[in-house]
C-alpha cells in the first residue's frame, strides 16, 4: 500500500492538498451556528443518495406514479425507510437553509467582499424551495396534483405573458402527463445539477475569502 500511495503522491501531491484543507485558520468567534451551511450540504447529499435509489422503482407517469410510490413503500426492501429519510432530510434541508440565511444576515456575512457568496447563497435558497415544489408533485396523489395546479397557475396573473408562462410550466394548457414529466426532469436532473454547480461556487468562495469576522 505504501508504494501505491507514493505513486499517487508523486503525481498528485495528495499530502499538500490534505495539509491545505486541514490547516485552514478558523476564527475564535466561530460557534455551532456556523455549521448550519455544512448541515444543509449533508442533507443535500442524503437527498441525492435516497432520491437516486428511488429512481430505480419510480415511474413518472400519471397512471403509474402513485402505484410506484406504494410499491416502494410496501414491497421494496427498506423502501419505506429510504423514502422516509428522503422526506425528513428534505424538511431538514429547508429548515437548516433558513437558519443559515438568518445566521449569515445577522452576523453580516453578506458584506464586502462577500457579496458574491451571498448571491450564490440566495440562488441556492431558491433552488432548495424549487426542489420542494417539484418533489411534492411526484407521488401524483390528490395533494400533489392540486398543488401543481395551484403553483403553475400563479403566473397567469402576470399581464401579457401570463398564459404563456403557465403553458410553459405545465407543458400544455392543463395539468397532465407533460407537467409531471417536466417536474420529474427538473427535480431529478436540472435542479440537482444547478445546485451542485452553485454549491461548488459557494464553497470555493468561502474557502478563498475565509469565514467572516464578528460584528
From Swiss-Prot:
GO terms for biological process: photosynthesis; respiratory electron transport chain. It is a multi-pass membrane protein. Heme b 1 binds at residues 100, 202. Heme b 2 binds at residues 86, 187. Coiled coil: none annotated. SUPFAM superfamilies: Transmembrane di-heme cytochromes. Heme c binds at residue 35. Gene3D superfamilies: Cytochrome Bc1 Complex, Chain C. This is Cytochrome b6. It comes from Chara vulgaris (Common stonewort). The gene is petB.
Amino acid at each position: 500500500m505504501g508504494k501505491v500511495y507514493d505513486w499517487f503522491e508523486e503525481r498528485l501531491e495528495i499530502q499538500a492538498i490534505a495539509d491545505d484543507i486541514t490547516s485552514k485558520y478558523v476564527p475564535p468567534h466561530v460557534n455551532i451556528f456556523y455549521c448550519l451551511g455544512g448541515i444543509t450540504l449533508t442533507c443535500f447529499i442524503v437527498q441525492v443518495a435516497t432520491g437516486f435509489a428511488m429512481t430505480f422503482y419510480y415511474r413518472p407517469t400519471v397512471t403509474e406514479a402513485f402505484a410506484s410510490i406504494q410499491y416502494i413503500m410496501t414491497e421494496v426492501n427498506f423502501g419505506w425507510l429510504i423514502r422516509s429519510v428522503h422526506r425528513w432530510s428534505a424538511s431538514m434541508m429547508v429548515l437548516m437553509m433558513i437558519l443559515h440565511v438568518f445566521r449569515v444576515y445577522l452576523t453580516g456575512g453578506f458584506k464586502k467582499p462577500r457579496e458574491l457568496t451571498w448571491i450564490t447563497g440566495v440562488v441556492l435558497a431558491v433552488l432548495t424551495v424549487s426542489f420542494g415544489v417539484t418533489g411534492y408533485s411526484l407521488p401524483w396523489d390528490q395533494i400533489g396534483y392540486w398543488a401543481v395546479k395551484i403553483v403553475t397557475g400563479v403566473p397567469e396573473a402576470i399581464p401579457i405573458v401570463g398564459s404563456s408562462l403557465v403553458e410553459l410550466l405545465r407543458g400544455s394548457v392543463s395539468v397532465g402527463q407533460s407537467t409531471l414529466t417536466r417536474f420529474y426532469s427538473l427535480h431529478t436532473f436540472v435542479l440537482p445539477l444547478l445546485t451542485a454547480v452553485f454549491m461548488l461556487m459557494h464553497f470555493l468562495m468561502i474557502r478563498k475569502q475565509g469565514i467572516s469576522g464578528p460584528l
